[in-house]
């Protein structure tokens, strides 16, 4: 319901932006609640009752309807609402070569709730060729006009890096990448490939969605992480900054790049809390993006 949509103003360089090009004076993060029809179709596909083509047809129609609503509301960007995804982040990660879908014993822990237990595991070295999200973007691009910009939202490289070491995932990850620097370089290279392919498909606005910084601000999260004495907030934030900035190297000047720093949102609950003081000097001063939400 766009009438209840939260519009997010944001700041870059100390000034509220008011350009007709991104970054915009007001904006959205691009993810929308899934319609009941979409959830029912996805469940029917999982149960083997409809084909992939049938599911895609439902997605196409509902995304088209959503874009019409975004335009009618006067929004400067249009997105697919992330309607083709089961998770906001994992579907993109599963699209890399060398990555497969798995389930863990537990899902992500939110305030009083737990998500489905989806995750990932490596099957080989990570590359970014032929990523399915490029085709997803092309569908949205066709609706772009002189008043709107088609945006592609993707999880940040730091989020991918964190997922590779979530719970027991690190054991498999280290079997393919005993050298952390090689892993960081391959993640960044895979992202650069996808970014190039999106750009070649006409994308001029990409958003990194990133919960890693929010987790670094959460006292309870760090209490648990510090059971491993080798883990420090300085070390973790340095890794996250490095992989994100490496992924952004060489991007075209006319490609706007923003980031949404999120505390998690599942059934209106949160995964992390706390002020930005632990990460502000790194995140806001050194990450090479055009704007933050």
Kindly label every feature range from the protein language model.
Residues 1-16:
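Short, Lys/Arg-enriched N-terminal segments with co-localized hydrophobic residues
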Residues 15-293:
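Domain-level signal for soluble alpha/beta catalytic cores
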């Amino acid at each position: 319901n766009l009438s209840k949509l939260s519009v997010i103003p944001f700041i870059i360089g100390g000034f509220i932006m008011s350009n007709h090009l991104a970054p915009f004076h007001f904006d959205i993060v691009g993810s929308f609640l899934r319609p009941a029809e979409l959830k029912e179709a996805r469940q029917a596909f999982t149960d083997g009752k409809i084909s992939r083509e049938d599911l895609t047809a439902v997605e196409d129609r509902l995304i088209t309807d959503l874009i019409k609503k975004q335009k009618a509301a006067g929004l400067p960007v249009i997105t697919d609402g992330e309607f083709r995804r089961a998770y906001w982040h994992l579907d993109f990660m599963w699209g890399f070569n060398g990555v497969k879908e798995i389930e863990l014993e537990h899902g992500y822990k939110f305030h009083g709730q737990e998500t489905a237990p989806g995750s990932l595991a490596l099957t080989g070295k990570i590359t970014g060729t032929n990523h399915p999200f490029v085709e997803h973007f092309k569908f949205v691009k066709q609706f772009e006009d002189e008043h709107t910009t088609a945006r592609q939202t993707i999880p940040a490289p730091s989020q991918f890096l964190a997922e590779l070491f979530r719970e027991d995932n690190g054991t498999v990850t280290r079997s393919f990448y005993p050298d952390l620097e090689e892993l960081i370089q391959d993640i960044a290279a895979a992202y650069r490939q996808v970014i190039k392919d999106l750009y070649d498909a006409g994308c001029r606005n990409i958003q990194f969605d990133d919960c890693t910084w929010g987790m670094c601000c959460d006292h309870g999260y760090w209490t648990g992480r510090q059971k491993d004495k080798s883990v420090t907030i300085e070390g973790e934030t340095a890794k996250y900054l490095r992989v994100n900035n490496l992924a952004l190297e060489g991007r075209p000047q006319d490609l706007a790049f923003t980031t949404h720093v999120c505390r998690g949102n599942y059934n209106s609950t949160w995964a992390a809390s706390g002020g930005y003081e632990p990460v502000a000097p790194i995140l806001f001063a050194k990450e090479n993006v055009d704007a933050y939400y």
